[in-house]
Amino acid sequence: MTDNSATANGPAGAPPLHGAIDVHAHFFTARLRAAMQDAGVTRPDGMPAIPDWDPKSALRHMDEVGIETAMLSVSSPGIDFGTPDAVRELARNVNDEGAELVRTHPGRFGLMASLPLPDLPASLAEAERALDDLGADGIALHTHYQGHYLGDPLYEPLMELLDDRRAVVFLHPTSPQCWKDTSLGYPRPMIEFPFDTTRAVAHLILSGTLRRHPGISFVIPHAGAALPVLADRIAVFALMQADGPPVDVLADLATLHFDLAGFTLPRALPALLNLTDTRHLLYGSDFPFTPDWAVEGLARPLVDALDPAVRTDLLHGNARRLFPRLREPRSA
């Protein structure tokens, strides 16, 4: 896997990412930021602040590190602020503005649309609008909505729609409802996010949701969170489900795609490669929650650790196969 030469990824000082497609990139609209502030969410999930974001700064950052395309999504805590009508309108706002960014900057941005869950009828309508009218590249879903995880039968109509559309779904963690009892005062992205991702994916598998809907391509963040370590444990316990659907946990995990946002070396990536193969790996920055200097600092050792063919697949080859609109590189 490794190529540790000093010039493994080009000359010294060159952007480390060489045309990467970033599947884990976030954005804010003015309306979303105002809704968060009005709701008192100024330190989302215990982070220090709502990070700054604007298209010009994002593009400058992308050019500096070598990202060709950023697939934009709304991070935790999402858009569930205010009345159901307000949430529906906020979903339309972030999706409309995201689609406009894609149109205004061809090849530089993609859109993973937000849905006003847990309002299922409105979410079905917004998913159709985003995919059909706005040309969204996929849908961003959080691990749960008001405590209902994605394997819940509540979401079956949505999963059917996404399966029929062969949609790409980017899964993003959010704080579990019990976070006040479990986070121990630490920022929730440190411990709660990885375990909520693990919980959500396990539920998708153990409920049979993943197997019932093979047309959905799920992207799991942060190198699979705790799944590479817990996969065998979950698989054995699954055999004890007397009343659950028959599942093959390891086979189902092998169908997923995994982004490498965050701290993947030296331990997480080797563990993940015991669970899946390199053609299921995707690059993710988690910008702007991961600031620009940290994106570059994490990217350089990652790309230098990979053989050239694996590096190409990770940075853009696998993403081009996953997202139809991106199958051809952007014209210079």
For each predicted feature, which ranges?
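Active-site gating/metal-coordination segments in enzymes
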Residues: E68, V74-V201
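Short, basic, glycine/proline-bearing loop/turn elements
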Residues: G40-M47, T143-H144, L250-H257
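Mid-to-C-terminal alpha-helical segments outside catalytic/metal-binding sites
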Residues: T2-V23, T29-T69, D96-T104, A125-R129, ...
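H/E-rich (His + Asp/Glu) clusters that bind or coordinate divalent metals
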Residues: A6, W179, Y186-I205, S217-A332
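Acidic-and-aromatic substrate-binding clefts and catalytic sites of carbohydrate-active enzymes
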Residues: P48-W53, I79-D80, L117-S123, Q146-P153, ...
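Hydrophobic faces of well-ordered beta-strands that scaffold small-molecule active sites
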Residues: I21-A25, A70-L72, G110-A113, I139-L141, ...
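Short, conserved clusters of charged catalytic residues that mark active-site
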Residues: W53-S57, P153, P157, V201-L204, ...
